[in-house]
Amino acid sequence: MEEFDLVKTLHKTSSSVGSDENSLHSLGLNLNTDRSSPHLSTNGVSSFSGKTRPSVIQGTVEVLTSLMQELQNSGKTDSELWKNCETRWLQLFNLVEKQCQEQIVAQQEQFHNQIQHIQEEIKNLVKLQTSSASLASCEGNSSNKQVSSESQMGFFSLSSERNESVIHYPESTEPEIQQEMSTSQPDCNVDSCSVSSGYGTFCISELNLYKSKDPKEFMEHIDVPKGQYVAPAVPAESLVDGVKNENFYIQTPEECHVSLKEDVSISPGEFEHNFLGENKVSEVYSGKTNSNAITSWAQKLKQNQPKRAHVEDGGSRSKQGNEQSKKTPIEKSDFAAATHPRAFYLSKPDETPNAWMSDSGTGLTYWKLEEKDMHHSLPETLEKTFISLSSTDVSPNQSNTSNEMKLPSLKDIYYKKQRENKQLPERNLTSASNPNHPPEVLTLDPTLHMKPKQQISGIQPHGLPNALDDRISFSPDSVLEPSMSSPSDIDSFSQASNVTSQLPGFPKYPSHTKASPVDSWKNQTFQNESRTSSTFPSVYTITSNDISVNTVDEENTVMVASASVSQSQLPGTANSVPECISLTSLEDPVILSKIRQNLKEKHARHIADLRAYYESEINSLKQKLEAKEISGVEDWKITNQILVDRCGQLDSALHEATSRVRTLENKNNLLEIEVNDLRERFSAASSASKILQERIEEMRTSSKEKDNTIIRLKSRLQDLEEAFENAYKLSDDKEAQLKQENKMFQDLLGEYESLGKEHRRVKDALNTTENKLLDAYTQISDLKRMISKLEAQVKQVEHENMLSLRHNSRIHVRPSRANTLATSDVSRRKWLIPGAEYSIFTGQPLDTQDSNVDNQLEETCSLGHRSPLEKDSSPGSSSTSLLIKKQRETSDTPIMRALKELDEGKIFKNWGTQTEKEDTSNINPRQTETSVNASRSPEKCAQQRQKRLNSASQRSSSLPPSNRKSSTPTKREIMLTPVTVAYSPKRSPKENLSPGFSHLLSKNESSPIRFDILLDDLDTVPVSTLQRTNPRKQLQFLPLDDSEEKTYSEKATDNHVNHSSCPEPVPNGVKKVSVRTAWEKNKSVSYEQCKPVSVTPQGNDFEYTAKIRTLAETERFFDELTKEKDQIEAALSRMPSPGGRITLQTRLNQEALEDRLERINRELGSVRMTLKKFHVLRTSANL
């Protein structure tokens, strides 16, 4: 859309418009109807003037409110989000509206500026029409002008092949342009109007020629010859007014030179101009129309910036010259011309008659010269030159043209013509191609080193060199050299265009040409024309572009031979003269004479070559001018009519363009409003669509997440259902198991109660039995006491009888003393041996039956109580061992057996309820006693083991509480405690014996009888222990710690004996126990008869009773261990083989059973050895 581009290029356009409205140098009318930039309004009123700009976005709040309501009605939106969006949208809309308003304001300003320009251009067109009529009348009256009407009007169509230059001055800074417009307006009489209407570009070139008030002004100058042609003066007032309303295409000298290269040669009479005496008027040609718009001037300026570099110093002096010209435009015009080489001044028509002079670029005055004026000899002396220079110092009107355009070299023109004839490419003879490198020009002009004021003052301190330089500088080779010479050269047609200040090498010093005709050069007819000191640098002198008028092609050819010759030709005069000649050397007459001689020779050669050429050229030009004079007025009229028609066309085109612009503006306004509305709607719709898309994406993601969550929850629900079913089944199983366990527990409680009742009943029975047993013990002790007394009395009586019989026999029968003693000894032995067939009391032999029984019992006892060590015992000790065994066996009375059985039943009942762990931890280390003391007193070992078993059974918390023993011993314990009776000397059986019985007793009989000494231990017992007589020292009770410390060593001994001497199985042992009980019953029949009558301490009965009770416990323990061993072996046999697959629990159970079996085997070995030691089990010796 067009307005978008307008917004982007706003700053550029505004800047260009600002430069356009301030620049009055162009009459170009830019009616640009391009749709992209509608800037013009012809009515002078902007389409927006008087109106307030509506809001850029109409209905912004309404649209936003409706959008917000729609989004909020859709729901599922956050209020904070909408507030933030609303705030940001409002800010965005305000920003866009502000920018659009600023753009519109800038457009309005631009429109106003364009309108002003158009109005001014229209006024200028009207003035052009009025001035064209006066020009036509002026041209009709002037008979000296031979100018073609077409070229005088300067109007050329676009199709014209004439490449005439429009000398443009690029835009400088606006203040500088305004100063130049006010003080140094160009003397260009050709007004170029470039109108760009959008449909085509038209250029109107008009030459402003005014007829002077007095026709005599043309020849009023004192030095102007009759043949000199002067240009009509231009009224300063009209030109100044025109400048105010018209824009001139003004070019810098650089651009002038460039454009002249491209232009076609113009007929000489086509460019006559008016030059006033004191004011320089630069001829500006109307050339090829510029088809570019107004904005192309900036581009032109950029292209020509490097070419203006060498005239900056002149530009700095231009302001000073302009100010001086403002104050004194008449009196100080020379100063302004000297200080500002680029200044252009408009001359008033009434000032001096020399205003009419040929342009420095047309070369028109050359062809008006007579043939005699083509060459002048050099002055004979320097003094004459100085005098001629001083005499030519006339009014400043003659010197104001010193800075005007200078003429090209005739040599250059000749060479150019030759090149064209040979169809060679044009040779660039100027130094403009290298403007930064100044031409090396040899000159003798001392005024080059003078300041402008010294040059202007007319006082020439170095008159002679100046005069000499006036002669030198106009030779064909040196005509382009920067000299201050007078134009009255021998080649007066060169117009003495002094270029001293315009050369790039010498920009500070404008040429100051004095109208001083040299005496020797009489024909100085065109000295006024030569004072057209161009404000352009010397390289930009407007040449007589191909002066030859032989053909039309020659007219149209371009001749840009600038005043500054190319660098290769500039030092042409220095062939015989040094390039650098100091000012002091110029005073030397020898050097000066040499210089003059060289220059004369050079001039002679040059003039001789050019004379024929110029004569032919002059003739052809004269013929051409005569042909053009006839049709000049008619051409002017035709051209004027064409111009009027063209102005009408332009006016109609202007109105059409204005209406077109207005319609386009209206259309653009409507489109802009529509675009803004559409932009709002589009932005709103796009934002809404984006928001909806975001919401759709969010809903999609949320739906995906919800689906995933649903799937995950379903899977979890299934897992929970399965877990719930499993838990339900487990709960049912647990309830059933709990019911079953509750039932079992109820049964167990009932059984426990029944067992508790039975236990109480058994306990009561046991208490009654214990009481009865105590009573029996008391009776037995009384009876034993009585028996012991009776035996003591009997023995005493026997002893007394023996003593009396011995005394009697010694007195009466002495010879048979030996036989009597032998018989008494034998009878005594038989009488004392228990089990003998003699009675203890009477000494008579007993019955046969009783004796057989006693013998059988004796043999059985001797066989049953013999240990493997008895085989090694000496035969001498057999009698005493037999006696001890008989006494041990006969001491077990029926009452003692009954008491033993009761104690065994009670002990085994408590022991049987112990756990296996307590059995292994308590029984195992307490089965045997220490090595020495256990072998001596097995009764004590049994009593201690019984106590430990009772204490261990009481520690079991899972069993019903047993009878705990109090710290004070009960009556039964007191009765069961072995009592050692300390007999008095009179009551002691041994000590009570009379001295006569002492020799009957053996050594063993004198010691107390011990039933706890085994026969197999007699060899190992020390002698001191056998010889002890105190029975209290023999009953030693070791503490529990000592017995436990020595258990392991004794156990090892017992196991060794068990494995070596008892390989028979356990059931045999059980049978032996039953056999033994039967044997003991049979044995009890003759117990009284087998009881020894010898002295037996009372304590031995109690020790024996404890020993028998401990053996019964051991036998019962042996039976239970054997039964448990059988059960474990049966369980192990039912387990799978180790090669098969078994579970971990099965393996653990198997290992536990094997460990238990090993422990039972060890216990069985220990118990078996203990029983064998006391001859309860059969040994290998008894088989």
UniProtKB/Swiss-Prot annotation:
Segments of skewed composition (Polar residues): 921-936
Chief localisation class: cytoplasm
UniProt keyword list: Coiled coil, Cytoplasm, Cytoskeleton, Golgi apparatus, Isopeptide bond, Membrane, Phosphoprotein, Ubl conjugation
Consequence of substituting residue 784 to A: Decreased ubiquitination and increased protein stability
Biased composition (Low complexity): 483-495, 949-967
Disordered: annotated segments: 28-52, 300-334, 472-495, 863-894, 910-999
Coiled-coil residues: 609-804, 1109-1174
Annotated consequence of substituting residue 781 to A: Loss of phosphorylation and localization at distal ends of the mother centriole. Significant decrease in ubiquitination
Function, in words: Negatively regulates cilia formation by recruiting the CP110-CEP97 complex (a negative regulator of ciliogenesis) at the distal end of the mother centriole in ciliary cells. At the beginning of cilia formation, MPHOSPH9 undergoes TTBK2-mediated phosphorylation and degradation via the ubiquitin-proteasome system and removes itself and the CP110-CEP97 complex from the distal end of the mother centriole, which subsequently promotes cilia formation.
Name of the protein: M-phase phosphoprotein 9
Species, as recorded: Homo sapiens
Protein's gene: MPHOSPH9
